[in-house]
């Protein structure tokens, strides 16, 4: 018969288990340096949304930070779907990251293979009719915002400030220029025009942004 589905799934370098039971080595460079990249999307009825676009961005992030891809693209697609299909709920949040290997703390690149971490968990679809309350904050992030790195401290702090103000999201700005939000791009439709920040080192090349433009 069919294998029993799981409540959620974690994956690390070939091992699968419940997220709560998974462990990661202390010497994984994500621990010391946040030395890795990630991407994330949703599975709806076990179909991963815009997967090719997310994989394009993931492999580009690896390239920009000189992190060897943890596995070939087609193999990663297969592994992501393997994770999605192990979970009972067909609607899931799907997250994966590559880190620059494992080794004693040293800033220079280690001579070890990169690591791959994946997890998927149930995620109900959001009510798109809800209105969002926004806070604003000066954008003090560094000039690697086009890379989806594990270094998210500014977004963590911005999200906490938004919560404290009873808001849903924080809009970053550099002076008079709006860049993006703590965990989303900003797109405005005004007077029939679609307005969003140009793609450069100050914003992430968002997949939803790309699909809105297309």
Where do the language-model regions lie?
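Helix-start/capping segments and mature chain N-termini
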Residues: 3-85, 104-214
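Ordered, amphipathic secondary-structure segments that act as subunit-interaction surfaces
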Residues: 80, 85-98
């Amino acid at each position: 018969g069919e294998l029993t589905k799981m409540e959620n799934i974690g994956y690390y370098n070939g091992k699968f288990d419940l997220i709560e039971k998974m462990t990661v080595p202390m010497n994984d460079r994500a621990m010391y340096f946040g030395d890795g990249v990630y991407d994330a999307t949703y599975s709806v009825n076990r179909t991963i949304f815009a997967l090719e676009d997310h994989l394009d961005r993931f492999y580009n992030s690896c390239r920009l930070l000189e992190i060897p891809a943890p596995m070939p693209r087609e193999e990663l697609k297969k592994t992501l779907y393997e994770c999605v299909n192990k979970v009972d709920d067909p609607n899931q949040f799907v997250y994966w990251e590559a880190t620059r290997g494992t080794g004693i703390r040293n800033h220079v690149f280690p001579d070890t293979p990169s690591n791959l971490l994946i997890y998927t968990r149930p995620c109900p679809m959001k009510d798109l009719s809800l209105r969002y309350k926004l806070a604003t904050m000066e954008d003090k992030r560094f000039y690697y915002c086009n890379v989806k790195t594990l270094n998210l401290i500014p977004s963590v702090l911005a999200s906490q400030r938004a919560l404290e103000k009873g808001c849903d999201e924080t809009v970053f700005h550099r002076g008079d220029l709006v860049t993006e939000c703590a965990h989303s791009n900003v797109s405005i439709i005004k007077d029939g025009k679609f307005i969003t920040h140009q793609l450069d080192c100050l914003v992430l090349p968002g997949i939803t942004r790309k699909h809105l433009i297309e």
